C-alpha cells in the first residue's frame, strides 16, 4: 500500500465523499486506513479509569484504502502514487505532477 500515516487524502466514494483529512493509521493487512474526521461512528464505552464517565463517544472507523486518493501537495488535487528507484532507494512520487514525495 502506497498511502502512509500522515498523508493528506480525499475520500472519492462512500457516504463521506469529498471530505479531506490526514491519515491517522494504516492497517495494511486488511487494506484499510483511518482518516481524521472521516467515517465517524458512535461507540458505547463502559466507564474505565481513563474515562470514568463512559457513555457514547464519536470515533473514526477504518475505510477501505481504495476509497481515498492522495492529495498532491503542490496542486492540492487528487493523484495516483507511483514508486521508482533512485540510488537504490524507493521513492514515492505523484503521477500527475511527477514530483517526488518525502517518505
From Swiss-Prot:
Similarity section: Belongs to the universal ribosomal protein uL24 family.
Q: Which UniProt keywords apply?
A: Ribonucleoprotein, Ribosomal protein, RNA-binding, rRNA-binding
Q: Which domain of life is it from?
A: Bacteria
The entry's cellular-component GO terms read: ribonucleoprotein complex; ribosome
**GO biological process assignments:** translation
Q: How does it assemble?
A: Part of the 50S ribosomal subunit.
Q: Does the keyword rRNA-binding apply?
A: yes
* Location of region: Disordered: 70-103
* Record's protein name: Large ribosomal subunit protein uL24
SUPFAM superfamilies tied to this protein: Translation proteins SH3-like domain
Q: Which GO terms describe its molecular function?
A: rRNA binding; structural constituent of ribosome
